[in-house]
């Protein structure tokens, strides 16, 4: 036990296993929020150094904190790391935690400020691979901007607690995890990004956000105004909304896309695309906008002669997604070739985003498939 821990005393974090030193500084929670997540006995034990009580106190918030950090950082791996650092800092400052404060908001405060520090220092992993299309592939219509972007598995979203956003929220939780929304967030300056997520996604009031960021309400209001204007420019709403997740309309698009991909039917694939479609890969040299450019890119870079694909459906960011596999002509084995995430608008595909192989394990997908045709390929 570490009852009455003093400044300079070392404690081992029960979540990460790392040793930390209590500095005596106070990590305050936003003032004025109703503390609805309090278990006073649990908090008291955690403050006294009870590691199992601390783990029980914070682990219930892990999933939602990871989603929060993912929105801010754009990388699922970086989000996991951020939450580990959050729990480490929380354990370090637990003796100074106010017993009747909100544990959830306190953790959000720590996580948000850790992410803000990471964004300001531009700590980004270098690209693991860079795909540069070779001639005769067409030139990209614009460069890639968010090379660190990663997809987020829907299975992790299903584990989120049933928390309603605050009264100031403008976005539904699922809307605020879409690939387009997360991409647009990455293009905002760090403080604008953080303020917009806290205010418009999580629904914290301006005074609460000001307390979390150690700033003024006026500064928060100004940052939010600029963030909303920038987001409107970066994230125009499509004329047609996407079909409901799991609906027959969505399933029909997924089935037709799978058949076109596995049979190498470029014409059938292009018929599914909207006129303003965007095909991109965060680590690629650029993105391809419009069917006039998308068709030759698909014909030359994606479906060259002799290449055969197999797709395994999954879901990412609340959207249809696939593990993509390419057949080895020598063995017939299908090897993983990245992930594909679809953005739908009405009955058309508005964006196709390809990610590298590093996300496969997080989605529980295999790295190879046995030889043999799929249901859409001839025997």
Protein language model annotation of sequence segments:
Residues 65, 69, 94, 107, ...:
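Hydrophobic-face residues of short alpha-helical interaction/recognition segments
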Residues 108, 118-151, 234-246:
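Short, basic/polar amphipathic helix motif occurring as a linker/hinge flanking DNA-binding modules
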């Amino acid at each position: 036990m570490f009852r009455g821990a003093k400044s300079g005393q070392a404690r081992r974090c029960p979540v990460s296993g790392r040793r930390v030193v209590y500095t005596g500084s106070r990590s305050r929670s936003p003032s004025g929020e109703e503390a609805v997540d309090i278990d006073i006995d649990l908090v008291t034990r955690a403050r006294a150094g009870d590691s199992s009580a601390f783990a029980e106190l914070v682990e219930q918030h892990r999933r939602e904190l990871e989603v929060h950090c993912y929105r801010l950082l754009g990388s699922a791996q970086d989000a996991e790391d951020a939450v580990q650092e959050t729990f480490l800092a929380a354990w370090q400052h637990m003796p100074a935690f106010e017993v009747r404060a909100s544990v959830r908001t306190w953790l959000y405060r720590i996580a948000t400020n850790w992410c803000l520090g990471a964004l300001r220092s531009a700590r980004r992993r270098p690209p693991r691979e860079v795909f540069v299309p070779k001639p005769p592939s067409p030139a990209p219509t614009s460069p890639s901007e968010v090379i660190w972007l990663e997809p987020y598995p829907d299975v992790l979203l299903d584990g989120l607690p049933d928390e309603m956003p605050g009264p100031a929220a403008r976005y539904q939780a699922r809307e605020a995890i879409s690939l387009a929304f997360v991409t647009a967030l990455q293009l905002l300056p760090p403080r604008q990004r953080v303020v917009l997520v806290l205010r418009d996604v999580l629904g914290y009031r301006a005074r609460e956000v000001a307390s979390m960021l150690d700033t003024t309400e006026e500064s928060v209001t100004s940052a939010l105004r600029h963030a909303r204007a920038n987001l409107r420019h970066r994230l125009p709403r499509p004329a047609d909304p996407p079909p409901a997740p799991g609906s027959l309309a969505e399933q029909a698009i997924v089935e037709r896309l799978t058949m076109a991909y596995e049979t190498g039917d470029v014409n059938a694939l292009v018929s599914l695309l909207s006129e303003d479609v965007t095909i991109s890969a965060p680590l690629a040299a650029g993105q391809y906008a419009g069917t006039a450019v998308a068709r030759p890119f698909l014909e030359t870079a994606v479906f060259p002669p002799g290449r055969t694909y197999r797709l395994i459906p999954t879901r990412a960011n609340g959207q249809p997604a696939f593990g993509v596999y390419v057949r080895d002509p020598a063995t017939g084995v299908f090897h993983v070739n990245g992930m594909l995430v679809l953005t739908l608008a009405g009955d058309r595909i508005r964006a196709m985003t390809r990610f590298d192989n590093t996300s496969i394990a997080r989605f529980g997908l295999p790295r190879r498939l046995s030889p043999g045709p799929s249901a859409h390929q001839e025997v």
